[in-house]
Amino acid sequence: MSAQKPGLHPRNRHHHRYDLATLCQVTPELAQFLTRTPAGEQSVDFANPLAVKALNKALLAYFYQVANWDIPEGFLCPPVPGRADYIHHLADLLGETTGAIPADASVLDVGTGANCIYPLIGVHEYGWRFTGSEVHAQALASAQVIISGNPGLTRSIRLRRQKDPAAIFNGIIHKNEQYDATLCNPPFHDSAASARAGSERKRRNLGQDKNDALNFGGQQQELWCEGGEVAFIKTMIAESQAFGRQVMWFTTLVSRGENLPPLYRALTDVGAVKVVKKEMAQGQKQSRFIAWTFMDDDQRRRFMARKR
């Protein structure tokens, strides 16, 4: 019996250790990156960015039927189990309104990235429809290649270029559109130097030396922004007020618990009717997302009834 990973959502497909033999059958290129831990167990060389990408490719193919997936060099290669957790907890939040998880939810992914990870998981697990926004032209092109390369996804995922790098919802949510939820993995560093320091810490934790290759890729807009995570989410909160009748739940990951108090104050200032925090855990890593709405319980029920 393989050991379970602590803390993952009950519906997460990644509770058990990876079956590397099966994953290598699905994605043969993964085999060249297998290694042994000091305890003699087979593992993946997580210090190698090509190994991490091959693992992601295998996980997406095996668990989510994404046959064709790739990202350009230098873009974030996200851990699939943690991204899946956000989707499952979001599903629970949407299900609280009517007592059932909606099968046809419409979700906006802010900053979908070159990897398009949240829409890929959400479409497979729940049949939702996604709009992915992205400011980076190369990331948008990469995500479109993934969508076009997998039959069926073009009907479920559409992409929009955010032409104003200072905006989040403005220019993306159109006048008569409605979304059950938004989600976002915001840039969390406040400078390029801070982002580099974070990568150094991760590298040391993996036992890499300073000159080793990084698997912690990421373009500037993926890793940092002026003012860091708090400033980014405050902008999101400020913009959300104008779309409070078009979106039922606004949500975003928050990397550090100490960032919550100023965000809660900002939500009070814009008149959010309800604010929810969802705690998550992937192995030793603790994470969370916050959700807010400008609709009361009755308004949310009517919103979902109208959309259906």
From Swiss-Prot:
Keywords: Cytoplasm, Methyltransferase, rRNA processing, S-adenosyl-L-methionine, Transferase. One of its GO terms (biological process) is rRNA base methylation. It catalyses: adenosine(1618) in 23S rRNA + S-adenosyl-L-methionine = N(6)-methyladenosine(1618) in 23S rRNA + S-adenosyl-L-homocysteine + H(+). It is found in: Cytoplasm. Pfam families: Methyltransf_10 (PF05971). GO terms for cellular component: cytoplasm. Residues 190-212 are annotated as: Disordered. Its EC number is 2.1.1.181. It is an enzyme of class 2 (transferase). InterPro entries: METTL16/RlmF (IPR010286), rRNA_lsu_MeTfrase_F (IPR016909), SAM-dependent_MTases_sf (IPR029063). Gene3D superfamilies: Vaccinia Virus protein VP39. One of its GO terms (molecular function) is 23S rRNA (adenine(1618)-N(6))-methyltransferase activity. Specifically methylates the adenine in position 1618 of 23S rRNA. Belongs to the methyltransferase superfamily. METTL16/RlmF family. This is Ribosomal RNA large subunit methyltransferase F. It comes from Citrobacter koseri (strain ATCC BAA-895 / CDC 4225-83 / SGSC4696).
